[in-house]
Amino acid sequence: MKLYNLKDHNEQVSFAQAVTQGLGKNQGLFFPHDLPEFSLTEIDEMLKLDFVTRSAKILSAFIGDEIPQEILEERVRAAFAFPAPVANVESDVGCLELFHGPTLAFKDFGGRFMAQMLTHIAGDKPVTILTATSGDTGAAVAHAFYGLPNVKVVILYPRGKISPLQEKLFCTLGGNIETVAIDGDFDACQALVKQAFDDEELKVALGLNSANSINISRLLAQICYYFEAVAQLPQETRNQLVVSVPSGNFGDLTAGLLAKSLGLPVKRFIAATNVNDTVPRFLHDGQWSPKATQATLSNAMDVSQPNNWPRVEELFRRKIWQLKELGYAAVDDETTQQTMRELKELGYTSEPHAAVAYRALRDQLNPGEYGLFLGTAHPAKFKESVEAILGETLDLPKELAERADLPLLSHNLPADFAALRKLMMNHQ
């Protein structure tokens, strides 16, 4: 597999290099040189396969012979060890539930596949994963790499800005997992990660790698569950499929669009954000004008400068698709709460991120179409807000219950690179 740097097309790397480096020169994102396509017949045949076999086939189309098929399938089996069911919400709407993994969020798919790829590629070489999280990434990455040999993980998160349960899920592990609460917002955490990757000495000393949705292995893994969703739908809905994606860093939407470029029948996508609506405003008037990030109920989407957007634009350019074909919506907190109550009346307990996606979908779905919205996290991960909004008590799934009483092991740091650098050099 060959990939190129979106900021410098002359920088070309293999899959292994892209996974190991995370980012290219000047913080450029890597993008596949070849965009494979399956025929309609091949797609139909693939949709009959089981999740793991099909996923290995999809990933192999991108990765090629860099990783032998049987090793790839074995690694996929280890990564995707849980289902991605479509729950029926209304006669014309389903929710693709991506929260049945160990940390109850969609990031388990990408995080675990990336961990499998990195450990396969690195062999005996030590690696340090540095990533920023607004909640779910941290947990997924921590659990994916926990206890794996030769890997150290450092996770930055905005202090007091993620739910207490989210914090318990990944800040109680210890071992090879180091968590750092930063005095600042998610964008401040992202900025620290960028500074670290610009520090050549630190990069070399620690074998630095990023683990957020910019890593190509995570992005490729996420393509697979779109195929799994379509495989569960009745034949007659497949050609009228509209998918609404709750969007923060836009990795999930990028993966969905890549699935479409492979030949998966998706009529259109909707990018659903909260009031951090840089992309909806851009799609509306062509002006890219990020505002200060606002805290919302759907906190994993509190991102005003989405990292993956350049990949979306590149895919549209390469496929000669029109950006105006992409649906969009920005949903405020009041509407989010109202929508969660509506879903509850339909017999479906949801959380803020999925509610944003459902709202956008319901408002834009035409008669005769079938809508899917992505359920990116288990409602219990947002227990406090979900209980307050719905006025009912949620049971904690065992994954959360067993961590609820453990002590937090995080370091507290200011949003200051020198302090972070010192911590990382001292703990290598």
Swiss-Prot record:
Lyase keyword on record: yes
Keyword Membrane: no
Metabolic or biological pathway: Amino-acid biosynthesis; L-threonine biosynthesis; L-threonine from L-aspartate: step 5/5
Catalytic activity field: O-phospho-L-homoserine + H2O = L-threonine + phosphate
GO biological process annotation, one example: threonine biosynthetic process
Domain of life per record: Bacteria
Residues recorded as bearing N6-(pyridoxal phosphate)lysine in the entry: K107
Activity regulation text: Is competitively inhibited by L-threo-3-hydroxyhomoserine phosphate.
An example Gene Ontology CC term for this record: cytosol
Gene3D superfamilies recorded: 3.40.50.1100, Threonine synthase, N-terminal domain (3.90.1380.10)
Keywords, alphabetical: Amino-acid biosynthesis, Lyase, Pyridoxal phosphate, Threonine biosynthesis
PANTHER family, A to Z: THREONINE SYNTHASE FAMILY MEMBER (PTHR42690), THREONINE SYNTHASE-LIKE 2 (PTHR42690:SF1)
Function: Catalyzes the gamma-elimination of phosphate from L-phosphohomoserine and the beta-addition of water to produce L-threonine. To a lesser extent, is able to slowly catalyze the deamination of L-threonine into alpha-ketobutyrate and that of L-serine and 3-chloroalanine into pyruvate. Is also able to rapidly convert vinylglycine to threonine, which proves that the pyridoxal p-quinonoid of vinylglycine is an intermediate in the TS reaction.
Protein name in UniProt: Threonine synthase
Provenance organism: Escherichia coli (strain K12)
Organism taxonomic ancestry: Bacteria, Pseudomonadati, Pseudomonadota, Gammaproteobacteria, Enterobacterales
